[in-house]
């Protein structure tokens, strides 16, 4: 049975699932769909064409689905899709997509968005990610599964952050970060590998292989793209090489790599 506070304002066109809790002074617009078990604390605002997945919990003063902060937006239909089992903490803002992007913003499952996180239009966030307090994603950013982004970090539009990577706090990232890398700074560059996350997700032999692969990719005698192409040729049908090297070759903004910044030493790995 759903629990809805008397002071909540809910459009008759909104769809509310079973066991939903809606706290005091929430405002729920016409195009909202709340799946079973969603919990809204007090003073949450949901607008636009927004879907919230099962058992997601949204804390006070969160604003989801309001008009994108993009001057090119002219009121076209767009969506915000939030998956299951997410925690969205106080004062977060997530905007829907635009005509200039994929027309939707997507948040996957089991993510933690800490207080004051901003996710702009057309962003895609995977599963099991943690965005710490004050993280800002500009438009069209892509974040893979199991990514951690430290507090007060800003991500430039169209940047991609691949699976298992970590961006240190107070960073400003303007280029792509491949799988399992650790980046830091303003501007942020890859400092090493996120071996802590690798140990959680991978077998030891795969960790060692990835470590050796990045040492070869970052060799000084070839460009990063040349190294990636060479690795794909020499390790055809290897899924790890395919994942990492294809990501590098698909980069439009370039990879956040500088030889003077990267270290393969163990002290960088945790």
From Swiss-Prot:
EC number: 2.3.1.129
Keyword Repeat appears in the UniProt entry: yes
EC category: transferase
Keyword Acyltransferase listed: yes
Listed GO CC annotations: cytoplasm; membrane
Catalytic activity entry: a (3R)-hydroxyacyl-[ACP] + UDP-N-acetyl-alpha-D-glucosamine = a UDP-3-O-[(3R)-3-hydroxyacyl]-N-acetyl-alpha-D-glucosamine + holo-[ACP]
Primary site of residence: cytoplasm
GO molecular function, one term: acyl-[acyl-carrier-protein]-UDP-N-acetylglucosamine O-acyltransferase activity
GO biological process, one term: lipid A biosynthetic process
InterPro entries in UniProt: Acetyltransf_C, Acetyltransf_C_sf, Hexapep, Hexapep_transf_CS, Lipid_A_LpxA, Trimer_LpxA-like_sf
Cellular location(s): Cytoplasm
Keyword entries, A-Z: Acyltransferase, Cytoplasm, Lipid A biosynthesis, Lipid biosynthesis, Lipid metabolism, Repeat, Transferase
Pathway(s): Glycolipid biosynthesis; lipid IV(A) biosynthesis; lipid IV(A) from (3R)-3-hydroxytetradecanoyl-[acyl-carrier-protein] and UDP-N-acetyl-alpha-D-glucosamine: step 1/6
Function: Involved in the biosynthesis of lipid A, a phosphorylated glycolipid that anchors the lipopolysaccharide to the outer membrane of the cell.
Entry similarity comment: Belongs to the transferase hexapeptide repeat family. LpxA subfamily.
Quaternary structure and interacting proteins, as annotated: Homotrimer.
Protein name: Acyl-[acyl-carrier-protein]--UDP-N-acetylglucosamine O-acyltransferase
Primary gene name: lpxA
